[in-house]
């Protein structure tokens, strides 16, 4: 997902990430404010203890929200690997009518998923294979969209 510059979550799903999106955006803005402090030199004016606390806070925010820092609006669709483990993400997406594409194993209920992909969501090779196909399809779709925009601009 990094290759096509799409937001993703690899750690535990932060509850309310979609349904409480403004609060999550505030946390992301706080993370970028801490980054700005490091670049403009105000970080150096703080005491050693304050710098340590802010560095720890930054690391925690990066771990939980780093990959979604560029997410400025709710996603148009979601891809979930382990529906059984990430049931909160599925519930939030369903509540907001966001289509869900997901790998569904035998221990999961596919009724909540809009586009289930029957696959083993525990084996790393299976996950890697499906994610590679999905990433390739997304990249192809983005390229087609880009070509259409260029074609429309040329006309």
Feature map (PLM): residue ranges:
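Acidic-enriched and Gly/Ser
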Residues: 1-64, 68, 72-75, 86, ...
């Amino acid at each position: 997902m990094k290759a096509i510059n799409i937001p993703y979550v690899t750690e535990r799903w932060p509850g309310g990430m979609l349904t409480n999106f403004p609060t999550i955006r505030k946390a992301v803005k706080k993370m970028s404010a801490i980054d700005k402090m490091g670049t403009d030199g105000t970080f150096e004016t703080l005491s050693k203890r304050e710098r340590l606390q802010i560095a720890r806070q930054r690391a925690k925010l990066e771990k939980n929200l780093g990959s979604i820092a560029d997410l400025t609006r709710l996603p148009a669709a979601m891809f979930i690997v382990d529906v059984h483990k990430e049931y909160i993400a599925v519930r939030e997406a369903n509540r907001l009518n966001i289509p869900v594409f997901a790998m569904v194993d035998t221990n999961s209920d596919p009724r909540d998923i809009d586009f289930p992909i029957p696959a083993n969501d525990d084996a790393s090779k299976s996950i890697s294979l499906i994610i590679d196909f999905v990433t390739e399809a997304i990249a192809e779709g983005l390229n087609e969209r880009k070509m259409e925009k260029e074609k429309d601009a040329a006309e």
